[in-house]
Amino acid sequence: MVYSYTEKKRIRKDFGKRPQVLDVPYLLSIQLDSFQKFIEQDPEGQYGLEAAFRSVFPIQSYSGNSELQYVSYRLGEPVFDVQECQIRGVTYSAPLRVKLRLVIYEREAPEGTVKDIKEQEVYMGEIPLMTDNGTFVINGTERVIVSQLHRSPGVFFDSDKGKTHSSGKVLYNARIIPYRGSWLDFEFDPKDNLFVRIDRRRKLPATIILRALNYTTEQILDLFFEKVIFEIRDNKLQMELVPERLRGETASFDIEANGKVYVEKGRRITARHIRQLEKDDVKLIEVPVEYIAGKVVAKDYIDESTGELICAANMELSLDLLAKLSQSGHKRIETLFTNDLDHGPYISETLRVDPTNDRLSALVEIYRMMRPGEPPTREAAESLFENLFFSEDRYDLSAVGRMKFNRSLLREEIEGSGILSKDDIIDVMKKLIDIRNGKGEVDDIDHLGNRRIRSVGEMAENQFRVGLVRVERAVKERLSLGDLDTLMPQDMINAKPISAAVKEFFGSSQLSQFMDQNNPLSEITHKRRISALGPGGLTRERAGFEVRDVHPTHYGRVCPIETPEGPNIGLINSLSVYAQTNEYGFLETPYRKVTDGVVTDEIHYLSAIEEGNYVIAQANSNLDEEGHFVEDLVTCRSKGESSLFSRDQVDYMDVSTQQVVSVGASLIPFLEHDDANRALMGANMQRQAVPTLRADKPLVGTGMERAVAVDSGVTAVAKRGGVVQYVDASRIVIKVNEDEMYPGEAGIDIYNLTKYTRSNQNTCINQMPCVSLGEPVERGDVLADGPSTDLGELALGQNMRVAFMPWNGYNFEDSILVSERVVQEDRFTTIHIQELACVSRDTKLGPEEITADIPNVGEAALSKLDESGIVYIGAEVTGGDILVGKVTPKGETQLTPEEKLLRAIFGEKASDVKDSSLRVPNGVSGTVIDVQVFTRDGVEKDKRALEIEEMQLKQAKKDLSEELQILEAGLFSRIRAVLVAGGVEAEKLDKLPRDRWLELGLTDEEKQNQLEQLAEQYDELKHEFEKKLEAKRRKITQGDDLAPGVLKIVKVYLAVKRRIQPGDKMAGRHGNKGVISKINPIEDMPYDENGTPVDIVLNPLGVPSRMNIGQILETHLGMAAKGIGDKINAMLKQQQEVAKLREFIQRAYDLGADVRQKVDLSTFSDEEVMRLAENLRKGMPIATPVFDGAKEAEIKELLKLGDLPTSGQIRLYDGRTGEQFERPVTVGYMYMLKLNHLVDDKMHARSTGSYSLVTQQPLGGKAQFGGQRFGEMEVWALEAYGAAYTLQEMLTVKSDDVNGRTKMYKNIVDGNHQMEPGMPESFNVLLKEIRSLGINIELEDE
């Protein structure tokens, strides 16, 4: 295996055995590809903005003598870059400019004569742009648009499973769901009549829609029924016989023909009888006259002599009618073939309940149902019906819908019109009737072949189209009203509705969510999330168990593990590692093709529908060298069931063992040994881990860590290979390799690093370089680590030495006992950055002012403010300190003449303003790390703002000039090379100042040309620099675009350092969570024979009942990894030669049965081996991939190599007494996470505060500075103790006895500790409520 330069620094030992046929795909492609499709020009007009424009334009005027046509569009450049947008609180977007053409036709002239054409580019609002990491910056905050899993358009056949009617009869229904437009439902009622609903309204007999489509009763019967023909000959009744129709019936008369009796009366007709009749080719049999009674005629019969209707189609025959027919000369009678078995008379029955009899009455009936209360006219009824399903503006099945529709009806072609045809409706009814007759199956709605993914691009396109349609109406009005000769396209288009629709979607749609930015994993998971909620989806209340359940088709598409606990369980899912969407939006997963019993490396992506026809082997099936299956019987999946198949039946094989799970679950080592419920908690809790001060790679990982860290975008990754030319904390410069340079560029890549910025969850984002000067790097190498990454690997927590044993009750009920050493070494110290903003507004009484001159505030409180009233950077502040001094004008009070005089003398201003300064919230303390001042255009900037501006300008200039220097140096080295090659002596050249070099002339023409080109580049570089500097200066000095009425905003950033403390929540990766109960002194912790104390003591009782044994295996393997690290460390300390080190490390990498990883250290230089050993001395990192991990024997081997007991248990001694514990204890290294549920954020106390308006009880919750609820159960407890006075105090003066509590406050102030409880306010509320019910309750004083 080839390792890049960075990967060689620390190679993770991989225990995986299955070959990696397919690399993990780029994890954010579902977001990026979808949005790319939305904004890129699509010549076909199938997707994105192009499709939206083409569907709405051209817009014609009502008269038809002018139209507005769409030509093309382009997106401009964004005004600010992503960082600037976040700082300023604006949206990162680009202006959309559309070229439109206004065509005016001659009025009197023949059709299509053009009078005038005007073309113009029109601004159509801003389109938010996606950042490189798949997010949007909306109003300064990063948001993610979550993909939606919704029911695919098409036709679905379903049943109520016997739940609707009391008899338990199964009622079938069909539903045609378009992409946009009205839903059409067909359903049976308990009497087996077929009904239709449009948009889930009142139901009508289904034949109404057929009549509205201009079918007569005869045609309807002809469509849905086979005919039975009776002939009257010589006063005898004969029937044309189709023997197959008799199957299963009982003969009501002797069936005979040609003098031979085939079936006797009363006998059941069997397949043998039918074969006999077919063999003898019996076509006609005589039937008794009574047999025809009750049959239904298939067409109208008219007496031709009188023109009188004898019987209408769909009438039941009686013997009288038969006689009449016979008399009027009708000898051949067509009736409908029905039976109770598989040809039900449903349509015939429905026609009997159908009140309409022609097209008009059917249309009117539909109109009445859709628009109750409006008087129907013929035109209105016709246009309404036409617009429902047959108009491209109002109805669209979409390509997906048409494909699903045709597949469902077993048609050959999969393309077709987006609107419905007569055949479509009739075929759906026919199929529904077939299902009712027992032929065919109903669909499974939860099958992933019937649910598709709607991603960002598609949802944005739909929203954009909504905006365009709103504009379309206005344009039509303007085209009809305005004077067309003076109008330009610009005058017709109002961009407001479009930008409003787009803004509404990105800002407040249910699927546009505030990004979860706790750590890189939570970002990636959020972008790969799939929600069934949202507009056009399900609602929490309506979703049943079936929708939430894991479905066989989820395999390899949606993760069966990662989903939230609580009301959203199963509705919000996560995309599996290898899953992707196909052109129709269905999820598909990759498989290896099996040809002639050999598993190839050819990869096919299959959707859930396609997969149903194949037999698919699991990824862990054993193969020999050639790729044949070793076992005769292989475990496979087929049609959603898992069973054994012989090896020659297999069509495909899974690509990887981790193809089933999502990214979050694939990071849990030994997932295969954990119970699913706990694995779910583990996957969810990894997303809540807070990035620690120093990231620490997991000793036991799964091999997915690098992919997640790199794809999440928190690290700086090399775009091109080269050599590190410069590196400091804030930037890395790479001199690019010659072969990767573009022609005519300096060949320098500059990476600016993010330093100490705030994430959405207030955690700290900071990048640190992990390369050093002169190192070679390749494309894709990690140059700098972000939060929670260590040498380019995801590192959410810390490796802790844990022991599983009880310790004095401090680990009762999942509590965790932690050593003081963990606090001393700052292992779980995290930095949180809070943003506090102070807004100065223009009020009715005058502007608010930001100043250090605040009334009634002592000197001490102002000590941390500068003269502008803003806190210094670096100040240590605690709760209640002033950060920004601000005064607000107060209403003028009438002054006495004396006061006026004093005011005039002393200029006292304190009385007419009140203090409204920004203070540090209670319970928060930290260091000010940054201050930003935003000033409205036209408002004078204060001193601090100017200082900040100057500093920013200096910094920008410094950055740009350094950048210029680096690029110049690159250029001049190339100029020097050309000059030296052209014959100039190097010594003389170096004595000459650099800017004079370009004045030299060369005799070699080719070299001279090269020199001139380089000179041009140099000028261009300087020009570019000036331009960039000017743009930067303009951006920094220009006023800010603030909300109406806002004059200034001051943002103060506080950094808070949080050490771990009792009450913080910690967890492992296997759903083993707990709260820290005590921080124990190091000397009291249990220690081993070498005197090494453990860091954490966990309760062994937390393991067996929860069945997450993965944590024990992780602990053992962690111990082995650490043991090997210790041996390497000892060798380094003894300064043993490189050969011995190389040999030992090689042994460690080679250990394990047929592992796929082959590390050959003989190809490494001594220096590389030493660096590798240096990085391994704290423990050799190990990968144990999901479902393909380390086996017990391998763990034991590794333990043996590290000179550790293979049981994984050692003897421990009590730190307090020095006595040995009575039995060996499992000790090892487990990866522990600190979760974002910190006790500092939850701790809260109140004495007096705000009260609820109606009940006068204290509010609840920390945010409202609320009280503690003394609930029902607590009242019972006090009642049980008989503590009457305490209870009285709780229910009155400490809660809602208004007079009592003020009195008590007064008493306490006076030093008199007595209380007088009165009437609780909520009791009065109760009285009022009872009175409102008409019961008068009065309290009488005795």
From Swiss-Prot:
It comes from the Bacteria. InterPro entries: DNA-dir_RNA_pol_bsu_ext_1_sf, DNA-dir_RNA_pol_bsu_external_1, DNA-dir_RNA_pol_su2, DNA-dir_RNAP_su2_dom, DNA-dir_RNAP_su2_hyb_sf, RNA_pol_bsu_bac, RNA_pol_bsu_CS, RNA_pol_bsu_protrusion. It catalyses: RNA(n) + a ribonucleoside 5'-triphosphate = RNA(n+1) + diphosphate. Changing A665E: Resistant to antibiotics salinamide A and B. PROSITE patterns: RNA_POL_BETA (PS01166). Co-administration of salinamide and rifampicin or salinamide and myxopyronin suppresses the emergence of resistance to both antibiotics. Pfam families: RNA_pol_Rpb2_1 (PF04563), RNA_pol_Rpb2_2 (PF04561), RNA_pol_Rpb2_3 (PF04565), RNA_pol_Rpb2_45 (PF10385), RNA_pol_Rpb2_6 (PF00562), RNA_pol_Rpb2_7 (PF04560). GO terms for cellular component: cytoplasm; cytosol; cytosolic DNA-directed RNA polymerase complex; membrane; transcription elongation factor complex. Acetylated on several lysine residues in the presence of glucose. The modification N6-acetyllysine is found at K1022, K1200. GO terms for molecular function: DNA binding; DNA-directed RNA polymerase activity; ribonucleoside binding. The keyword Calcium does not apply. Its EC number is 2.7.7.6. One of its GO terms (biological process) is response to heat. Keywords: Acetylation, Antibiotic resistance, DNA-directed RNA polymerase, Nucleotidyltransferase, Transcription, Transferase. It is an enzyme of class 2 (transferase). DNA-dependent RNA polymerase (RNAP) catalyzes the transcription of DNA into RNA using the four ribonucleoside triphosphates as substrates. PANTHER family: DNA-DIRECTED RNA POLYMERASE I SUBUNIT 2. The RNAP catalytic core consists of 2 alpha, 1 beta, 1 beta' and 1 omega subunit. When a sigma factor is associated with the core the holoenzyme is formed, which can initiate transcription. The rRNA transcription and antitermination complex (rrnTAC) consists of RNAP, NusA, NusB, NusE (rpsJ), NusG, SubB, ribosomal protein S4, DNA and precursor rRNA; S4 is more flexible than other subunits. In pull-down experiments interacts with CedA. Belongs to the RNA polymerase beta chain family. This is DNA-directed RNA polymerase subunit beta.
